Design a protein with these regions (language model features):
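N-terminal Rossmann NAD(P)H-binding glycine-rich loop of SDR-like oxidoreductase domains
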Residues: 4-21
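NAD(P)H-binding glycine-rich loop region in Rossmannoid oxidoreductase-like domains
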Residues: 38-68
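Conserved Rossmann-fold NAD(P)-dependent oxidoreductase catalytic core, especially the SDR/UDP-sugar
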Residues: 49, 72-102, 119
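NAD(P)-dependent short-chain dehydrogenase/reductase
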Residues: 98-102, 106, 110-162, 167-178, ...
Length: 226
């Protein structure tokens, strides 16, 4: 019998995950569906909880809404589906908490302990198909500036280190983890970092002119999967 699957959050990663679960039900906060309110009354076997407020500068400005969706939305989901196998989207931002978003993802990791069959998975700078060029993610931002020939600005001197993860690899491993009996918290990344300036050269083919802005309070200098 085919397992009943729910995917919350059908943005960049959720859209790629749907390729592996074409018959899954979906729930997306962008469509006005509130995960803090009543959730679908169905006995799901497997749930991927990806829905979240994630743009870090916006989360800083709208902290209450970020906490409501990311924290209380997760608690609501865990309480609503006590018998499902659940994977929660965590983040490398909780490794060194410097933002409201990172704080909420640390909460998500700890909340996984409230459920008998739950795994929180920490993502590391995911890139790939269906990712919007606009927004705060590093890879699409660089590609957008290169294609539009617009001035590139970064925070800091470009010596930040990042572990970038291809979304195709990420979703395949999410499926494997869903079928496993692993619980608690785990990491999905390559464990191999690249310096931002070198990454810029890789995408552009050379080092373009860059405007270096001051480091922000929420900027993390090194993000690497163990």
């Amino acid at each position: 019998m085919e397992k009943r699957v729910l995917i919350t959050g059908v943005g960049f990663i959720g859209t790629n995950l749907l390729k592996l679960y074409p018959n899954a039900d979906t729930l997306d906060i962008k469509d006005g569906q509130d995960i803090c309110d009543k959730l679908p009354d169905k006995p799901y076997d497997q749930i991927f909880h990806l829905a979240a407020k994630h743009h870090i500068p916006t989360c800083e400005k709208e902290a209450e809404e970020c906490i409501r969706v990311n924290c209380w939305g997760t608690i609501n989901l865990l309480k609503t589906y006590p018998n499902a196998r659940i994977i929660l989207a965590a983040s490398s931002s909780s490794n060194e908490i410097k933002s409201v978003y990172g704080l909420t993802k640390a909460f998500v990791e700890n909340a996984s302990q409230l459920h008998k069959n739950c795994l929180a998975v920490k993502f590391y700078n995911v890139f790939g198909e269906h990712q919007k060029l606009e927004g705060g993610a590093v890879t699409p931002k660089l590609i957008w500036h290169m294609l539009t020939k617009t001035p590139l600005e970064i925070n800091g001197d470009g010596t930040q280190a990042r572990d970038f993860t291809y979304v195709g690899d990420l979703v395949k491993n999410l499926k494997l983890l869903m079928e496993s009996d692993q619980r608690g918290v785990t990491h999905l990344g390559y464990g191999d970092t690249i310096i931002l300036n070198n990454y810029i050269k890789l995408i552009y083919g050379k080092m373009p002119k860059v405007k270096n802005n001051p480091i922000q309070l929420f900027d993390i200098l090194r993000s690497e999967s163990p």
